[in-house]
Structures are given as structure tokens and as C-alpha cells.
């Protein structure tokens, strides 16, 4: 049971981070379907940082360095969405799809190139971080507390305060609801949308490194992040683009994802002889069912996905 709780919180943390990233972007008026690719790039930045940093450096320095590099990589990669969607006013759905494909391919090629440079016989896309990963975990009475859990809680609270209690957040949401009205009172819609996209990239990149360090000590980048970017979008929609509802939705989906990892620890589930693949499918099937019943009542930001043209005010 303790292991189930541990994995539920860890997987929920990933979904909260990435879904909050999508929330900031869409609240500003830009649809970010490229969260999957951003997660992969953020994961690559963090994993390579763990690989090249000395394993014996202070744990706090390891944690901060990996987090910052993941955030920076995700932020830089999301700038591609900003340039295409905000500056060139391109179709945001197509851009997001392209970012997902490019992110996976680019990360695989970069990691393979680094591995080949270090060892010509190593053509894999693997990055190992067995010792480095220990810096992120503290054992508390059999419960493996991950520092990313605390980080996620802090970011969740900060996201709520930012969106609802600050001028920046209120202006950001105004740009996603009625950009013409926001512009008429002096708000720079383009800057607000850029801010939303870059925050989305930063949180998506951080979610990527949390994902690949959840329970494993190496990662093969050609596998991507198993659709977690899309699952985070479902969490965001189910959570009605509101931080606290997103957190509750993430816990629900995180529970079903965790169950696929630890079901063998529950005798009554093992006795059912259900194939493991069914448990792996659960979070995605649940997301389809939930969205089918709740999508009619979802209220997305009115101007999301619509390029802003100041001349049409």
C-alpha cells in the first residue's frame, strides 16, 4: 500500500507540472499540444546533466542543477511554439504535433551522438544515472520521498497565487479570454502569450525529468514519455484549467498509472489474472471515458488557439 501511495504521488506530480504548463499556455490563448515533445527535451537536458556532473557533488547542487537544466531546455524548446504561433500566427495544432515528433527524434539523435563520441561501439539512446538519482530520494520509514514531490507542491501553490492573486496572472487570463479588450486597456497581448508559452515549456521540461527518474535509473530516449504529455492535457481539461482541480484530476490519473506498477503487490489483483497490459492501459482508457462525459461542460478560454492580430481590434 505504501508503494502505491508513493507512486501515485510521484506520477501525480508529473501530471500536475505538465498540466499546469499547458494551463498557463492556454490561459494566455495559445494551445500547446507539444507538451510531449517538451517533456522529452526537458528530460534529455536533465539526464545529460546528471550524466556529466560528478556523482559525489553535494545532493542539493545536483538537484538544483538538474532541475534548472530541465527547465531551461524545455523553455528554449517551447520558444519554437512561441515563434510559430505568436509571431507567424501559424496553426497551433499543427505546430504542437510537429514539436512532439521533432522532440523525440532530436533527443534520440543527440543522445546517440554523445554516446558514440564517448564509445564508438555504443549506438544506443540510453542515459544512465544510477548513483546520481540517489540525490533526489530520502527514505522516510520505508517511504521514498522524492524532492520533486515537494517542488510540485510549491509550484502548485505558486501557480494558484500567480493566476488569481497577481496582476500578471489576471492579465494573462484576460489575454486568453478577450485579447482585444486586454489590448484596449494597455496590456501587451503578445508579451503575455509569450510568457504563457515559456512558462509552459519550463514546467513541461521539469515534468520530463521527473518522469524518467520515477522508479528507473536509466532511460532510452527513443521510447519518449509514453503519452504523458497528452495525458496531462486530459488532466488539464478535466481540471477545468484551474490549478487545484488539476491537482485532484492528476491524483486520480496518477493512481491508475501507479496501479500498473504495483498491482502485483495486491494478492486479490494477482488472483484475477488480468494481463499487465490492461493495467498499463487504465489511465488512458479512464481519460477517454472522463473526457467523453465531461467535455460538454468544459469551458476553455474563449480565445485559445486564435492568433491575435492587433489590427483587428
Where are the predicted features?
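Transmembrane helix-bundle core of multi-pass membrane transporters
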Residues: 103-165, 268-278, 298, 305-313
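Alpha-helical transmembrane segments within multi-pass membrane transporters and channels
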Residues: 58-106
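Helix-loop-helix "hairpin" substructures at the membrane interface of multi-pass membrane proteins
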Residues: 141-220, 244, 248
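Short, non-helical or kinked segments that cap or interrupt transmembrane helices
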Residues: 24-45, 64, 86-99, 171, ...
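Membrane-interfacial amphipathic/re-entrant helices at transmembrane-helix boundaries
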Residues: 1-19, 31, 45, 54-65
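Transmembrane alpha-helical segments in multi-pass inner-membrane proteins
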Residues: 217-284
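Cytosolic-side transmembrane-helix boundaries in multi-pass membrane proteins
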Residues: 159, 177-184, 188-191, 263-313
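Hydrophobic core segments of alpha-helical transmembrane domains in multi-pass membrane transport
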Residues: 18-19, 43-47, 104-108, 149-162, ...
Amino acid at each position: 500500500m505504501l508503494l502505491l501511495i508513493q507512486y501515485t504521488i510521484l506520477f501525480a506530480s508529473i501530471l500536475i507540472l505538465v498540466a499546469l504548463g499547458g494551463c498557463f499556455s492556454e490561459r494566455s490563448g495559445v494551445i500547446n499540444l507539444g507538451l510531449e515533445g517538451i517533456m522529452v527535451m526537458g528530460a534529455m537536458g536533465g539526464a545529460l546533466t546528471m550524466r556529466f556532473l560528478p556523482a559525489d557533488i553535494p545532493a542539493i547542487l545536483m538537484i538544483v542543477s538538474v532541475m534548472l537544466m530541465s527547465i531551461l531546455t524545455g523553455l528554449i524548446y517551447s520558444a519554437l511554439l512561441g515563434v510559430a504561433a505568436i509571431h507567424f500566427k501559424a496553426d497551433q495544432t499543427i505546430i504542437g504535433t510537429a514539436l512532439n515528433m521533432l522532440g523525440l527524434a532530436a533527443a534520440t539523435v543527440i543522445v546517440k551522438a554523445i554516446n558514440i563520441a564517448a564509445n564508438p561501439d555504443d549506438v544506443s539512446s540510453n542515459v544512465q544515472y544510477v548513483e546520481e538519482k540517489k540525490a533526489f530520494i530520502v527514505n522516510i520509514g520505508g517511504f521514498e520521498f522524492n524532492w520533486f514531490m515537494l517542488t510540485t507542491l510549491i509550484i502548485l501553490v505558486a501557480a494558484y497565487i500567480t493566476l488569481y492573486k497577481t496582476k500578471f496572472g489576471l492579465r494573462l487570463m484576460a489575454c486568453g479570454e478577450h485579447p482585444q479588450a486586454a489590448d484596449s486597456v494597455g496590456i501587451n497581448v503578445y508579451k503575455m502569450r509569450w510568457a504563457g508559452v515559456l512558462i509552459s515549456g519550463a514546467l513541461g521540461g521539469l515534468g520530463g525529468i521527473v518522469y524518467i527518474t520515477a522508479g528507473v535509473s536509466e532511460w532510452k530516449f527513443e521510447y519518449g514519455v509514453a503519452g504523458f504529455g497528452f495525458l496531462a492535457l486530459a488532466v488539464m481539461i478535466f481540471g477545468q484549467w484551474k490549478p487545484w482541480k488539476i491537482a485532484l484530476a492528476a491524483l486520480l490519473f496518477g493512481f491508475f498509472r501507479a496501479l500498473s506498477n504495483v498491482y502485483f503487490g495486491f494478492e486479490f489483483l494477482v488472483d484475477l489474472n488480468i494481463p499487465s497490459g490492461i493495467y498499463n492501459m487504465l489511465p488512458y482508457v479512464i481519460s477517454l471515458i472522463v473526457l467523453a462525459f465531461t467535455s460538454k461542460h468544459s469551458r476553455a478560454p474563449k480565445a485559445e488557439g486564435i492568433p491575435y492580430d492587433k489590427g483587428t481590434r
